[in-house]
Regions:
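Short amphipathic alpha-helical interface segments
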Residues: 8-12, 16, 83-103
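Short acidic, hydrophobic short linear motifs in intrinsically disordered regions
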Residues: 18-26, 100-111
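Short alpha-helical segments that sit at the start of domains
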Residues: 1-8, 65-91
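Short Lys/Arg-rich amphipathic alpha-helical segments
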Residues: 1-44
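Short amphipathic alpha-helical interaction segments
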Residues: 33-41, 112-126, 139-142, 173
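Minor-groove-contacting beta-hairpin "wing" of winged helix-turn-helix DNA-binding domains
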Residues: 56-57, 62-66, 137-148
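Phosphate-centric recognition/catalysis
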Residues: 2-3, 153-193
Length: 193
């Protein structure tokens, strides 16, 4: 039996992403030459799956087979479980943690301009998408939140570099030239005094 078929069988049976280390252990492979065969087999499987309803993707914890997004409505009919609906506040909180980690609840509140409800943080922790990394060394020692590998896996990302890029904010002076005059005037006045 060829290694590609064995890897595909493992991926089909797995209920989690499988890493190269997992493949080496399960296939009882120890040499670097055989490890390159694993990588080559994965590459070939990825090519084969390009024209199928599922694909082989690399996520933070390894590789997994998943149904392509365009089939999600059909697949959803198999389960009666309704998908988790996240509130705007929950999505904003998760986004802030993903983009600006590690952050405290206070940091999130400063950015959002409103209080973060306890149930929002609890939901994100219960889903396994965020965790406490440590505590900021300030009075009160607030918890520092970061995203987890489960967050990356559930949102089909290999790492946080896969997050969409945030739009760059324009320079305020480009928006209003009067601001440049005011800033320049203030600077001159300060130097003269």
């Amino acid at each position: 039996m060829d290694i590609k078929s064995r890897i595909e069988a493992l991926l089909l049976a797995a209920n989690r992403p499988l890493s190269i280390i997992d493949f080496k252990e399960m296939l009882e492979i120890s040499s670097e030459e055989e490890e390159s065969e694993i990588l080559n087999a994965i590459f070939n499987l990825q090519k084969e799956y390009e024209n199928r309803p599922s694909n082989l993707v690399e996520v933070s914890n390894g590789y997994r087979l998943q149904i392509k997004q365009e089939f999600s409505e059909d697949i959803a009919k198999l389960w009666e479980i309704k998908p988790l609906r996240l509130s705007k506040a929950t999505l904003e909180t998760l986004s802030i943690i993903a983009y600006m980690h590690p952050v405290t609840r206070g940091d999130i509140e400063d950015i959002r301009g409103v209080n973060v409800a306890t149930n929002v943080v609890k939901l994100l922790i219960d889903q396994g998408w965020i965790k406490i990394k440590g505590y900021r060394d300030v009075p009160g020692r607030p918890a520092l939140f970061i995203t987890t590998n489960k967050f990356l896996d559930d949102f089909s990302m290999k790492d946080l570099d896969d997050l969409p890029k945030l739009p760059e904010l324009p320079d305020p002076i480009d928006i209003s030239p009067e601001l440049a005059l005011e800033v320049k005037t203030d600077q001159v006045d300060e130097k003269e005094v």
